[in-house]
Amino acid sequence: MSDPQSDPKWPRSILIYSSSAAGGMPHYAHYQAQELARRGIAVTMLCRPDHPWAASPTRYTMLRGLPVPPVGRGLVAKALRVWCHIWGHFVLLGAIMQMRPSAVLFEENTEYFAAIWAWPHILLRWLGLPYIINLHDPVRALWFGPRWFGRLSLWAAYRVLKGGLIHGEPPAGAYLPRWMVTEIVPHGLFGHMAEREPPFDLRERLGIAPDAFVLLSFGHITDRKNQHLLVEAMAQVPGAVLVIAGPQPSTRQRGAAFYRQQAAALGCADRVHVIDRFIPDDEAAACFAAADAAALTYDRTFVSQSGVLQLAAQWNRPVLASGGDGPLRAAVEGSGIGIFVEPDSTAAIVSGLQSLMASPPPDPARFAAFRESASWEANVDGMLRLLRRVKGLG
């Protein structure tokens, strides 16, 4: 580990722990790594073999040593997923001891079962290794196992950390212990998706009329996105079509069959399309090219940022959004690239959707300004400021 007090170019090396392979998190970590490496910092990403950038040329080094958790509902599969999560942090420990990086970055919150894996990392932090994290969701309310174990895991995981990158002012209920230093940074753009040519016309494939208004709900199918309220809204807004596109990460939440049955019961099955699988990048381009607007209708507990907002901005697509007070609301209302409505309300969604359908699209200059502000350069500037702050250098 290099000594920042005697090294004006500190940090010279950063080890990124990227344990996910789906959704926006691995892309977020990739773009951070690319920008760090562009500045001459030696970056190694510890990731899974199925990381979405594993087969692509990168400016940084990929160490594909994390275990791949199995899929399935059985007890054995669940136990193996827990083991993979815990073991991954010991793989990280081995990589640290071998590489001796200047700092470690976690791609996202990783406190689950930290009561088991955190202790050697706490020791390394105490010995001077700075650990920082991307605080995509600073409100932590999900527990695994007994509540005491969950609270201990949360405390232990945050004891590893010295600082975090956050997308706005900490929302109400954020878990930020007194020792945590934070730095506000923008959520950068996933530019590789916008560079893809759509491989097909999604409207044509789904049989959607050219004059229909297509509302796209993109990404993981989860209850907190209020997609059932979007289906209810379709029944009340003739001329609107809903496309839900993304995988279902949990069988404990409403899935594709639920939304199809709901749409059939409400008489709008011909205007609700559910594509319940992982959407490759080129098909993501087809989804946004076909859409007139994107739905980010989170429930009131959501106080984070959404990578789908950045995707919508790249295609100049306005958003219909909801949620609690947090970075998503600030971004939508501050940029003027969409409408933010009351969360958890079908009536509010209907009103917002009708407003989008009746109004001309936002000025393209607003999208351009939003894209200009959502830069990875600014994100990494903030990361380096944070690292120097936690080392007492800035």
Where are these regions (language model features)?
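Nucleotide-activated donor-binding/catalytic signature segment of Leloir-type glycosyltransferases, i.e.
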Residues: 256-279
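N-terminal strand-loop element at the rim of the active site
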Residues: 9-10, 18-23, 27, 34-88, ...
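Conserved donor-binding/catalytic core segment of Leloir-type glycosyltransferases
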Residues: 209-225, 231-234, 242-245
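A short helix/loop element that forms part of the nucleotide-sugar donor recognition site in Leloir-type
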Residues: 194-208, 259-261, 364
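A charged, aromatic-enriched C-terminal amphipathic alpha-helix characteristic of glycosyltransferases
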Residues: 24, 344, 358-390
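Glycosyltransferase donor-sugar binding loop
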Residues: 51, 241-258, 277
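Acidic donor-binding loop of glycosyltransferase active sites
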Residues: 286-303, 317
